[in-house]
Amino acid sequence: MADFQDELLALAGIDDSDVASNRKRAHDDLDDVLSSSSDEDNNENVGQDYAEESGGEGNEKSEDEFEEKFKNPYRLEGKFKDEADRAKIMAMTEIERESILFEREEEISKLMERRELAIRLHQQNAQYMAQSTRRSTRDKPLTSAAAGKRDKLTELKKRRQERSARSVSERTRKRSPVSDYEEQNESEKSEEEEGYSPSYAEEKVEQVSKDNASANLYDLNAIRLGRKHVAEYMYHPIFESTVTGCFVRVKIGERDGQGVYRLCQVKGILESRKPYRVDGVLTKVSLECFHGRSKRVFDVNVLSNEPFSDHDFQRWHHQMMEDKLSMPSKNFVQRKLNDLRDMSKYVLSEKEVSDIINRKKELSRVPSNIAAEKTRLRQRRQAAYVAGNAELVKEIDDQLNTLEELSMGSNQNSNSAMDQLAKVNERNRRRNHTEIRLAEQRMNEERRRLSAAATATPMSAPTSVLTGTSPQPSPSLSTSIMSTPKLNPSESVVVASEKASSPDLSPKLLPSESQIFDEGIAVTQTPNTLEDKDFKLHEKAVHGIDDIIATVDFGIDINI
């Protein structure tokens, strides 16, 4: 022990003659240096512990405050306020329900982002205060004596390292290269660890483990793409590279009147065979999606705008475990979230805007005469079919399907107007049918009334107005009138009661005035009194005019 202390004093520049006299003083100096350094370390550790303790208490307190301040207003399933709100939303149509839930999802996402930013800002402030405390402890001004002692100790450490390095170099000549490599790595690791405090190393390990942790339901909803998002950005120049790796909620069918959805990950963008419309936008974009190891291509119009439910996430997680696939990490989710933000903030150049417009025009281009174009394509298809060219037939079929889609989109407004006109025509036809039925009922009632009046009135021969006598009717009256009626558009026999009940329904097949006179039937003028009307009705009933009216074709053209 004495030899080691002498060596230390010799390294410090003290002669051998002064060793005995100055040994006590050297011991005191060395003890002072070690004690001063230990005191500084203790002070630094005390400051660090105090900062960590205060920071930890502050973090717990701040998290509680932030949890209360940024409280999610939709506590029920993360989408509804309460049971009444849930019943109200579920009673809406699917479009209205998805729109409201999409708005609530964005509201919750913004609220969570504000909460995370507030927590991070508070943590950064706490770390800054802790670093300031440690820095103030280290930067405490030293006295000249303490500074000299520290310089001597530094010099001693340097010389010891040089001597140990020489001894190591001598020993390494007899050792293997593998052991040298391991020792070098260990020394490098030890040197690197000396430059970092244990607390920082623990924070670094904790951060790495947190980044490599599996993503949860909240993380996947952060990088979920809805139908509205895809329809808005599907012509964007960096759309394909951005959405690859994101997640979508796909509707695959219905069960018991409810939609069945699957959580899928987008692996690529494909082009569909024919264009289709998504929220009024014409496109040919299709998504290649994976659910576990199952792969399928979906059109954009089957995507849902609602967030993933817990059932969707659990089923997808079970499928990933069953297929022995690794879950995406939180670090991956953060990268995709940054990509989505970059795409939303991307500024398009003039050339990119022109390309987007040209792509939309190319899809929405409609021929001037769609019918003629379809006829021409069908003729080409028939010729290709006869020639046995299956590829050309398939190509022409795709063109015909495209024309059908375009014609449906271009004629949407006109078809709507035609539908309205068809409804008006149908309403008019029903009204005309009702009016005709009522007119027939009135005629039947009038006929029954006239028949009843004819049976109740005594049989008396009418007197002719022209001759004042009662002419005898010819036996062949009914036969001649009913068998060979002649039309006279200017003059006809009109019954006053029928004219009053149905003025628009005038019979066409009535005997002419000359024919009636030739057969000996007296024709009176239009009666002016009620007695004349009754007399004429009685005369018509007696002479069989009812039979004539029953055989008359009114000739009314009504479109039903």
Swiss-Prot record:
From the record, what ranges are coiled-coil?
Answer: 387-456
Indicate, by first and last residue, each region the UniProt record lists as having compositional bias (Acidic residues): 180-195
- The Basic and acidic residues compositionally biased stretches are 148-171, 440-449
Q: Which InterPro entries match?
A: Plus-3_dom (IPR004343), Plus3-like_sf (IPR036128)
Q: Does the keyword Nucleus apply?
A: yes
Q: Is the rRNA-binding keyword given for this protein?
A: no
Q: What is its main location?
A: nucleus
A molecular function (GO) held by this record is:
single-stranded DNA binding
One GO cellular component assignment for this chain's record is: Cdc73/Paf1 complex
Identify the Pfam families for this entry.
Plus-3 (PF03126)
Q: Where is the sequence biased in composition, kind Low complexity? A: 451-480
- Keywords for this protein: Activator, Coiled coil, Nucleus, Phosphoprotein, Transcription, Transcription regulation
**Which segments constitute the Plus3 domain?**
214-345
Q: Where is this region: Disordered?
A: 15-74, 128-207, 440-486
Q: Which GO terms describe its biological process?
A: transcription elongation by RNA polymerase II
Q: Which PANTHER family does the record match to this protein?
A: RNA POLYMERASE-ASSOCIATED PROTEIN RTF1 HOMOLOG
Assembly and partners are described as: Component of the PAF1 complex.
What is the role of this chain?
A: The PAF1 complex is a multifunctional complex. Involved in transcription initiation via genetic interactions with TATA-binding proteins. Involved in elongation. Also has a role in transcription-coupled histone modification. Important for TATA site selection by TBP. Directly or indirectly regulates the DNA-binding properties of the TATA box-binding protein, and the relative activities of different TATA elements.
Record-given protein name = RNA polymerase-associated protein C651.09c
Q: What is the lineage of its organism?
A: Eukaryota, Fungi, Dikarya, Ascomycota, Taphrinomycotina
